[in-house]
UniProtKB/Swiss-Prot annotation:
One of its GO terms (biological process) is ERAD pathway. This is Long chronological lifespan protein 2. Keywords: Signal. InterPro entries: LCL2.
Amino acid sequence: MHLIYFLFLVVGCSASLFDFIQNQFGGGGQAQKSPEHYEAQVLNSNCDKYLCPGTSLCVDAPKFCPCPYPSSQLRCFLPDGRYLCISKPAGDVAANYDDPRTNWKVDAKDDNIRDCGWVSRAWKGVV
């Protein structure tokens, strides 16, 4: 009788362990969406202005599109009116980039710190 209880215990623990491992390594997450799903989402949106390609948000103009990961990215404007998103600098200067209304204006004036000032200098070929 003890053998049966022991087997139930081992089987139960094994099932729990394998379920845990499957969830940790991607087995329990959502399936990736196909390009067709993304295309259908874009084509079926009710946006009558501009639909941001990275976030599917409806905004007045492309310059108002946010970065896909605003808590960890800066939106840097290029001289031709476009923008690109880069990772926020880390380390001692990271606090300078916390406010999304002003973080794109900060220029550390240091080519070792990749911020919007660095992007501007790189655009001009100075870096």
